[in-house]
């Protein structure tokens, strides 16, 4: 029992303190079950036992299952079933002890850790914001597999349990007590174990779980109760609307929770295990764990950041008070970063500040912000014209129109504002950073900072390294992005960088499907079925067809200026074929009154009837082909970016694609999607698409070979 400290006091109460050797947190690793089995053996044989307290020697109580073990699971086989059942058996033995068992929760108790708490008769938690409890498995593509679904449903009733099971909510002490996830709160760490022992002494007979008592009834009613039947129907419909059937975990959770109410407790636990091991081996779980847990952890921890001391900007200037500049200023103000919002006219700068005021007003109206909070936030934004004092600003971000000559002029004129240790960022979405850097006296301090619209909702920033950008500047930019609460994705300089290149292929494939003869509504439906937030035609209307045309013209002019053929957007032929004539017809997108859609005064949209004129083909395209074309087109472009060195890591490729572009989250990102399909299987399908629909799906075998080699090296 190297991981468990066993201590019996004079009252016969045993305190079992979990302290997993060589780990920062207690987890349900391979040593857990044998250790817990030994603990149960000793407890069952303990003479004069009057109660048990489970505590932790770590800063957290228990972190749950070992995700590395789950990633290594390939099949839902008998061995996996036996392993999970063995872990659950020790929890069942605990709740069968003839004495009360109390969980003394000093810190986070999540997943398998909270499932241990549910197997106890009483739960006392420390009054600390870090002492959260919950079952977040659904966010990892899993379900709680150590009795969590069955026990929480029995403890709270179906309706309340589903709010935690299907959303993966984590509750702080007050909320946990109010919702019945814990039974008591103590204010001091030193009071936890004494409080647990006091409860045991006061309740010596409270050792039988409610669900093991004769005549047990589920809170709120059983599965046949009219109210519960209504909850089941509504939950099923809402679940499909939210997941589109692309995420198996929520469906399995609902299935286990409902059916657990229709069978005996131990049978329900076995059903839970069967569903759990099926999810363990699923590509959706591996995608969620790899991308959303380990990937996000790598970025938050600074693993992908250059080494060096943390840097914090004390002052900022945003140049251009349009939609992007105003949004960036709002992000700064929320993070309490004093910001000078510049424009050529003070009225425009003040209008930019009014954008933040409007967002605050919405938050106040919804009860998410106090009036004083609004005033405090707005105090961090100063509308202005002209330069701030020389050397006074730690970070300057130009967010003027996507015109290279204008940007070069603004950069040169405003560079003097920078403090000696400051950095200068350009919010360009496609223009080469290395060329813009030529407008400033020190290109090593110049970097791309590409925000996404709307800035207040799209909390990711594409950081673009120019040819001369220093590692120190990258480190500061990385720290700045995290300072304002956004996710940094680092890429290297290239036309369109990463996000604009891939996003362009999504919209172009929508146009290509239109040209090939697919009905516009079917195109949008295919994107929805693929898991995209919205269809490519609607997206085009939102970003505007005219903007896309301007970007193409800008790059063509840049090619002429440099005497090169960059090949920017060379595969996006359908975009030109469809959108240029539409623009000539006055259909430039939503802000211009109409594009792919018509809009009425209330903003209701209907697909434009004139789209049929762009159909050149009459092929009956299978819906699965359309889905694959939408996904594979983006994945292939992402793979090209990774292979060309535009992207540095698969983590950034996956997270950047999901949060900046909207690549379907259930896949874990574009590169994880390829891995989930299997590199060989993906390549074979891409070759089929290339043969049927064009060379844009053709990728040299060498690129797939290099990806497979990266996989082998990682393994």
Which stretches of residues belong to each language-model region?
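Conserved CoA-thioester-binding segment of acyl-CoA-metabolizing enzymes
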Residues: 1-55, 92
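N-terminal glycine-rich phosphate-binding loop for ADP-containing cofactors
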Residues: 2-9, 19, 74, 81-85, ...
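Amphipathic alpha-helical interaction surfaces in cytosolic regulatory modules
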Residues: 31, 45, 58-72, 91
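Short, active-site-adjacent cap segments at secondary-structure transitions
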Residues: 59-63, 110-111, 431-432
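Extended, non-globular alpha-helical segments
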Residues: 69-93
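Gly/Ser-rich catalytic serine loop of serine hydrolases
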Residues: 103, 107-113
């Amino acid at each position: 029992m190297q991981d468990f400290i066993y201590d019996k006091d004079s009252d016969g109460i045993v305190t079992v303190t979990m302290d997993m050797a060589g780990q920062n947190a207690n987890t349900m690793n391979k040593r857990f079950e044998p250790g817990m089995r030994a603990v149960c053996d000793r407890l069952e044989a303990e003479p004069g036992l009057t109660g048990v307290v489970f505590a932790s020697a770590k800063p957290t109580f228990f972190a749950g299952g070992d995700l590395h073990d789950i990633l290594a699971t390939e099949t839902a086989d008998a061995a996996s079933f036996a392993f999970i059942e063995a872990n659950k058996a020790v929890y069942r033995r605990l709740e069968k002890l003839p004495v009360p068992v109390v969980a003394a929760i000093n810190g986070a108790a999540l997943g398998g850790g909270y499932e241990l708490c549910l197997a106890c008769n009483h739960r006392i938690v420390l009054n600390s914001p870090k002492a959260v409890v919950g079952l977040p498995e659904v966010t990892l593509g899993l379900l709680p597999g150590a009795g969590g679904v069955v026990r929480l449903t029995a403890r709270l009733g179906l309706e309340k349990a589903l709010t935690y099971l299907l959303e993966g909510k984590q509750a702080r002490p007050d909320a946990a007590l109010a919702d019945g996830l814990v039974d008591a709160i103590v204010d001091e760490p030193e009071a936890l174990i004494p409080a647990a022992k006091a409860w045991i002494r006061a309740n010596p007979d409270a050792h039988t779980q409610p669900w093991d008592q004769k005549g047990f009834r589920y809170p709120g009613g059983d599965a046949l109760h009219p109210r519960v039947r209504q909850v089941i129907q509504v939950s099923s419909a809402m679940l499909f609307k939210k997941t589109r059937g692309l995420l198996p975990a929520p469906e399995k959770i609902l299935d286990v929770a409902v059916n657990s109410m229709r069978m005996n407790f131990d049978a329900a636990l076995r059903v839970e295990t069967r569903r759990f091991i099926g999810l363990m081996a699923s590509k959706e779980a591996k995608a969620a764990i790899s991308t959303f847990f380990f990937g996000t952890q790598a970025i938050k921890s600074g693993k992908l950041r250059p080494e060096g001391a943390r840097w914090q900007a004390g002052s900022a200037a945003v140049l251009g008070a349009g939609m992007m500049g105003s949004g960036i200023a709002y992000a700064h103000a929320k993070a309490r970063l004093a910001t000078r919002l510049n424009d050529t006219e003070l009225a425009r700068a003040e209008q930019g500040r009014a954008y933040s005021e409007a967002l605050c007003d919405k938050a106040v109206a919804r009860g998410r912000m106090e009036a004083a909070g609004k005033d405090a936030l707005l105090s961090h934004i100063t509308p202005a014209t002209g330069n701030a004092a020389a050397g006074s600003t730690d970070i300057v971000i130009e967010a003027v129109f996507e015109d290279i000559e204008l940007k070069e002029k603004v950069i040169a004129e405003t560079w003097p504002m920078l403090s000696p240790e400051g950095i200068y960022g350009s919010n360009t979405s496609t223009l080469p950073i290395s060329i813009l850097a030529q407008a400033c006296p020190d290109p090593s301090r110049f970097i791309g900072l590409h925000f996404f619209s709307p800035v207040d909702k799209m909390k990711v920033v594409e950081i673009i390294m120019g040819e001369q950008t220093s590692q120190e500047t990258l480190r500061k930019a990385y720290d700045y992005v995290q300072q304002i609460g956004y996710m940094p994705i680092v890429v290297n300089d290239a036309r369109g960088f990463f996000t604009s290149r891939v996003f362009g292929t999504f919209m172009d494939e929508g146009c290509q499907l239109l040209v090939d003869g697919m009905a516009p509504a079917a195109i949008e439906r295919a994107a929805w079925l693929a898991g995209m937030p919205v269809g490519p035609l609607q997206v085009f209307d939102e970003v505007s067809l005219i903007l896309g045309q301007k970007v193409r013209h800008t790059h063509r002019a840049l090619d002429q200026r440099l005497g090169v053929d960059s090949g920017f957007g060379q595969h996006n032929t359908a975009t030109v074929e469809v959108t240029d004539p539409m623009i000539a017809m006055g259909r430039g997108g939503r802000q211009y009154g109409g594009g792919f859609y018509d809009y009425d005064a209330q903003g209701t949209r209907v697909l434009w009837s004139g789209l049929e004129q762009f159909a050149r083909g009459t092929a009956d395209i299978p819906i699965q082909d359309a889905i694959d074309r939408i996904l594979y087109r983006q994945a292939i472009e992402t793979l090209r970016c990774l292979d060309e060195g535009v992207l540095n890591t698969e983590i950034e490729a996956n997270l950047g694609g999901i949060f900046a572009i909207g690549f379907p989250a259930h896949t874990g990102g574009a590169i994880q999607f390829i891995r989930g399909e299997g590199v060989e299987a993906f390549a074979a399908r891409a070759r089929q698409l290339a043969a049927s629909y064009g060379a844009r799906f053709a990728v040299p075998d060498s690129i797939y070979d290099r990806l497979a080699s990266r996989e082998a090296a990682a393994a």
